[in-house]
């Protein structure tokens, strides 16, 4: 039997005693991350009935669950991930790498010339334990998401992305400011205090 490290034991203890984990189980969300999006949306009103949005790196699907409830039948939610994701009512899921032409073609077919109001991205790489390489891989994913948003969002659209503060953060903020009229930071209560994660919100795409 594998011996758990002190850090994994601490994570397990925190997870078992996590208020948001219990709430997610009670409310039927697939992950506690749902409450991060709910809190941000409460403040910024990004998702409302009729919103058309793409959820990048969607698995296991808690952000797509929230989005589907908020957009209602008049909106549309497109979820994309390399990993499989169990079906969610009101969500069109494409399994594949959103950099690839065939995946983009599927997305554009489903979008059917509707303007894309919002791109949301809660992606993170599989962490190796090497802080330098993990940070670089994280921002690489963020850059891919920003490129997707810049290509597909309508003028005036919004982009919400998770980043980790550290090397590359200021440069990424600068890149977002070139594309969006305003860029703001959000740190929802459901984000663990010890985590360096923060959400960047770009509004009013140029």
UniProtKB/Swiss-Prot annotation:
Sites where the protein binds S-adenosyl-L-methionine: 61, 63, 81, 97, 122
A Gene Ontology molecular function term of the record: rRNA (uridine-2'-O-)-methyltransferase activity
Active-site residues per Swiss-Prot or TrEMBL entry: 162
GO biological process, one term: RNA methylation
One Pfam family from the record: FtsJ
This enzyme's EC code(s): 2.1.1.166
Principal location listed in the UniProt entry: cytoplasm
A cellular component annotation (GO) from this entry: cytoplasm
Key words of the record: Cytoplasm, Methyltransferase, rRNA processing, S-adenosyl-L-methionine, Transferase
Spans traversing the lipid bilayer: none
UniProt KW rRNA processing keyword: yes
Top-level taxonomic group: Bacteria
InterPro entries: RNA_methyltr_RlmE, RNA_MeTrfase_FtsJ_dom, rRNA-MeTfrase_E, SAM-dependent_MTases_sf
The reaction(s) this protein catalyses: uridine(2552) in 23S rRNA + S-adenosyl-L-methionine = 2'-O-methyluridine(2552) in 23S rRNA + S-adenosyl-L-homocysteine + H(+)
EC class of the enzyme, as a word: transferase
Subcellular localization: Cytoplasm
Described purpose of this protein according to its UniProt entry: Specifically methylates the uridine in position 2552 of 23S rRNA at the 2'-O position of the ribose in the fully assembled 50S ribosomal subunit.
Family recorded in the similarity comment: Belongs to the class I-like SAM-binding methyltransferase superfamily. RNA methyltransferase RlmE family.
Protein name: Ribosomal RNA large subunit methyltransferase E
Provenance organism: Neisseria meningitidis serogroup B (strain ATCC BAA-335 / MC58)
């Amino acid at each position: 039997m594998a011996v758990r490290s002190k850090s994994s034991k601490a994570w397990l203890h925190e997870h078992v005693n996590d208020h948001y984990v219990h709430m997610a189980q009670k409310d039927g969300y697939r992950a506690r991350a749902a409450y991060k999006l709910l809190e941000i949306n409460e403040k910024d009103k990004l998702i409302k009935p009729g919103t058309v949005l793409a959820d990048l790196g969607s698995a296991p699907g808690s952000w797509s669950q929230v989005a589907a409830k908020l957009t209602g039948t008049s909106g549309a939610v497109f979820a994309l991930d390399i990993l499989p994701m169990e079906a969610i009512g009101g969500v069109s899921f494409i399994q594949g790498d959103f950099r690839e032409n065939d995946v983009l073609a599927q997305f554009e077919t489903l979008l059917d010339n509707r303007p894309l109001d919002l791109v949301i991205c809660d992606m993170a790489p599989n962490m190796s334990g090497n802080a330098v390489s993990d940070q670089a891989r994280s921002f690489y994913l963020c850059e891919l998401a920003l490129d997707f948003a810049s290509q597909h969002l309508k003028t005036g659209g919004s982009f919400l992305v998770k980043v980790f503060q550290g090397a590359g953060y200021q440069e990424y903020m600068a890149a977002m400011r070139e594309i969006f009229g305003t860029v703001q930071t959000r740190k929802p209560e459901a984000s663990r205090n010890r985590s360096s994660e923060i959400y960047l919100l770009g509004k009013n795409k140029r």
